[in-house]
Curated annotation (Swiss-Prot):
Family: Belongs to the TMEM43 family.
Disruption phenotype: Viable, fertile and no developmental defects until 5 weeks of age.
Tagged with keyword Repeat: no
Purpose: Involved in lipid metabolism and utilization.
Membrane topology: Multi-pass membrane protein
UniProt name for this protein: Transmembrane protein 43 homolog
GO biological process: lipid metabolic process; nuclear membrane organization
Pfam families (UniProt xref): TMEM43
Length: 376
């Protein structure tokens, strides 16, 4: 078996890369757990001080200025959002215009005859040119064969999102940050044809073309969608500032602003937000654990040489023939230990549970090792 110094000399590039992955994964995990802690404490603080508005006459005498409140009801839009060139007019929080252009697209197919892809010459590639609807300009100046495959340099009509100036729930206006959270877009379909004869309407899509079924390069098509139609019921949690709903800032500086469709109670809104936070946290936990796992995998040989030197850790040393299982356990333990450090000061019980879970593989293998020595 090679010595530790020899292994380091022969594997230092991959070992260094593994250390970088491990540090990145550990940092990401610590940041994610800290964010989860602060978000949970922010939700607890907001829930403890919230007032659910009932829109009664008596509430006008209650001092709600600066308080976090819960509103639930149909939204009202002051002025309609319009696209006059397409005879579109509707009362909604947002109206999104998505513009696509019919363009040339290049696809290169490599023919590898034994050389690596990086050394393959241009004469061993085949270039295909097709026409597709694209949201962004495809720069045809970079094409291998530019002759007859020229795209326009810009969009004559740009994609855009209109936001209503005044939106209300009851007598309270929704601030800009609240309106920004309306992102549940629905496709807008209309039977009213534009007055411009150069614009065709087909299956709810507007075409700037002579022939919908045979478009030419440079032709446009526009798709419209909306979010927050007037009359739809939404539940919002935020702070009242004057007559406007804005984000509530907790004592730790964490903004709380919740927007969910439907007539939901305070408990239902916070339950949905807590569930969304948990899913988001677990996604980043997986990313952090994956980085740590690959970092450990890059250093399998070095870790084995280190672990075999310590009797209580020898059982954790990755098997050189089947290292994946050992690496999974090591990454699992390290990830949970890092998460426990972030939680233990704010939620000691959760932190202690994570720490015990992280130490469980070590305790299990150590117990088996002690039992094995007793049998000897």
């Amino acid at each position: 078996m090679a010595s530790l110094s020899e292994t380091l000399r022969s594997h230092w590039p991959i070992a260094l890369f593994g250390v970088i992955l491990f540090v990145a994964g550990g940092t990401e995990l610590y940041w994610n757990e800290g964010r989860a802690v602060h978000n949970m404490m922010a939700l607890d603080e907001a829930h403890a001080d919230i007032y659910s508005v009932r829109f009664t006459e008596e509430e006008q005498e209650v001092g709600l200025e600066g308080r976090i409140v819960h509103l639930s009801g149909p939204i009202l839009v002051g002025e309609p959002l319009t696209e006059p060139d397409y005879n579109i007019q509707l009362l909604a929080v947002k109206l999104r215009r998505r513009v696509q252009m019919y363009q040339w697209v290049e696809e290169a197919v490599e023919h590898n005859y034994g050389d690596s892809v990086g050394t393959t010459h241009s004469d061993s590639r085949t270039y295909y040119y097709t026409r597709e609807w694209r949201d962004k300009i495809v720069d045809s100046r970079n094409f291998y064969n530019r002759h007859g495959h020229t795209n326009p340099s810009h969009f004559p009509i740009e994609s855009h999102v209109q936001v209503a100036d005044a939106v209300f729930i009851g007598r309270y206006e929704l601030g800009a940050e609240v309106k920004e959270k309306f992102n549940n877009y629905q496709e807008l379909t209309s039977d009213i044809r534009p007055e411009d004869s150069g614009v065709k309407l087909h299956l709810g899509i507007y075409y700037h073309t002579n022939d919908v079924f045979n478009p030419e390069v440079g032709d446009l098509r526009l798709l419209f969608s909306f979010a927050g139609m007037e009359g739809e019921v939404f539940s919002v949690v935020g702070k009242l500032s004057g007559n406007k709903l804005v984000p509530y800032i907790t004592s730790r500086g964490v903004p709380v602003l919740l927007v969910y469709p439907g007539g939901l109670s305070v408990q239902e809104v916070f339950r949905l937000e807590a569930r969304a936070q948990v899913l988001h946290t677990w996604w980043w936990r997986f990313v952090g654990w994956l980085l740590i796992f690959f970092g450990v995998t890059c250093n399998t040989k070095i870790l084995r040489l280190l672990f075999v030197r310590v009797p209580l850790l020898v059982a954790l040393a990755p098997d050189p023939q089947f290292p994946v299982t050992g690496n999974l356990l090591i990454a699992f333990s390290l990830a949970l230990t890092i998460a426990a450090v972030a939680w233990i000061l704010h939620r000691p019980v959760i932190g202690a549970c994570l720490l015990l879970a992280g130490a469980s593989p070590y305790v299990w293998f150590t117990r088996n090792l002690v039992d094995y020595h007793r049998l000897d």
